Amino acid sequence: FSYTQSIKWLTFNEALEAQKIKPKKIIMDVYTEWCGPCKMMDKNTFANRDVLNYINENFYAVKFNGEGNEKINFFDQEFTNPEFIDRRKGRNSTHQLTKFLQVDVYPTIIFFSEEGDPIIPVKGYLNPREIELYLKLIKKGDYFAFRSEDDFEKYKKYFRPKFRN
């Protein structure tokens, strides 16, 4: 068994195409260039061996700049960033897909089903043990059983993380 050193990041278009060949859920990291917590997640969470191995084995991983200029084809629509300014320092205009997915906090992790449908957004910084809960919850499909916020809180309370922080 060999360990890779990093997550195999794809573009969203690549992940959606890969799903047609081999269905897998998608984890999308919506970030920006200026976001401090996003950089911390790259350094502490996505570089964690337990996290990266679990993601590489079970998901298509997408890194998406919420203020970038990538052209995305999703739900039979084309999403772009018409007001994007190249080489701009700091904040840029918000990508149409970012708005469509209702992302208003960076970082936001969005999980998608094998069919490409959004499942859940998770807002803010997550350490390895915090993201583990969501990775396993989504991978196993346990979220289907939740009928309320209380159900999720119970799940969280009894969840025992195995990843090292």
PLM regions: where:
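A short, hydrophobic beta-strand/beta-hairpin element that forms part of a small beta-sheet core
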Residues: I27, A61, Q96-F100, V105-V122
